[in-house]
Amino acid sequence: MIDVWLPVIRKLKEKNDIKIDFVFPELSSLQHVEKNSDLFSLAEQFSDDVIYRGHSNRWFVAPTLIEALAGFKVSNAGEKMAALSSRLTNGKASKYLILKTIGKYISAISKYFSYIKENFSGQSLYDLSLFKNVNGILCDIIKEHKYTNKELKNELKDVPKFSMLHGLAATWVMDEFICDKFVTKRSDVTVYTMSNLEVSGYKKCFGILDENLVHSGIPRHDSDWIEFICNQSTPVKDDIFDSFVLIIGRPASPYNTPERKKKALRDIYDVVCMKHKLKLVIKRHPKETGDGIDNRIYNEVLGIENYGKSWMYSDMHPFVLGKKSIFSISFFSSVVIDMLAINKPTIEYLNLEGLDLYDSSDSLRDESGNPVFQFRYVNLVLGVSAKLELEQYVESILNQYEMTISPLCSMYKKYFMPFDGASKMVANDIYKRVESHKISQQKDTFVNLNSESKK
């Protein structure tokens, strides 16, 4: 979410006296923040206050992201209690009433200890009613319905909202944009569409008015923003291989099980590292960090003894890594669209065949009838499900680069119609609408006062 709005925030901050606070309503959004990443450094530059929900479910405010992370940090014992509670109340064990009840008790105990810890930590409590004083909110309206946003939704109901999709996507083939009937119209939301193909979905499924739909392309693909990001990387972080293939990480999941992820990685290692003598740099997904199953998979398949020799991790921004890479490989990620903005192709290795939830009559399918996800369906990636296909596309990229990437770039331009200066355009539009709303509020106040004086 932050990554999408940062280029616009940068332009807004160039205007006088604009204060922008970052709000984290979900615990997981701060839990998975990687403070050594380029994205964290960028966000720290442009945030004023940081408002976040603590483990006790209370709201706090800190002047910087670093201080918010320090206040949010929980002990190892607390993490284990929270994880156990989650497994018992939401996992497979929850079908047993006694275990689910135990999980709820553990959750209550965990929150109590968090409450005590927060009281002694020196964190500053935040009064949610202060949100009524803000002039606008930058958000993704698609996520407005989430339970964690319920309090914010109530406090911000009269505040103008400006929305961009939190991750790049082919929304026009997503379930959220395919609804049976029109919803109630609403005038409090302005949406900056990345593709004109999103318009009908926003109108029908989210009630957005025509005059509040503004085509913006993809602001984070502005050339000055990409240049700004690349210039931010420190010399220490530049210590990566001179030539490499970028792996865009994704945690193991029901659609990419640990076994399937292992197989894909083995095939990638065999083709890229063994056959073509190339190296791998892995940009991990925020949920892959730590000592979980995903790191164990990388260490097991790629060989921990080979770390720094044939493969390594990097926290650098995807644009920086993408520019340095030969090409990228993903397991399913919106970053593939970012790669096309810098003229780099991505091979998506994902096999959904035989998975009941993803290989059904409702599944998207490619020309060969294979079940696929959105990016493969709309031809923004080179899709593979097996080693032979991977070998063919790697050969094609290495030997016929322009011919291989050209169709992908054509689809990118067709769908999104990107243009330079999008972030400035969006910032100016937001500023204009906020000022207009402030003037209308002043007029309403004047009218109300006059009507009262006549009574």
Put a short name on every predicted segment.
Residues M1-W225, E288, V336:
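Active-site and donor-binding regions of nucleotide-sugar-utilizing enzymes
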Residues E14-F22, K275-L280, G308-W311:
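A generic structural motif
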Residues Y126, M316-H317, E389:
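Short acidic active-site motifs
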Residues N135-G136, T190, F244, K279, ...:
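Structural motif
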Residues D210, N306, S334-P418:
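Catalytic binding pocket for nucleotide-activated donors in carbohydrate/polymer assembly enzymes
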Residues R220, K287-I342:
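Donor nucleotide-activated moiety binding/catalytic core segment of transferases
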Residues R220-E300:
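Conserved catalytic-core segment of nucleotide-activated headgroup transferases in glycan assembly
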Residues M417-K455:
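C-terminal alpha-helical cap of glycosyltransferases
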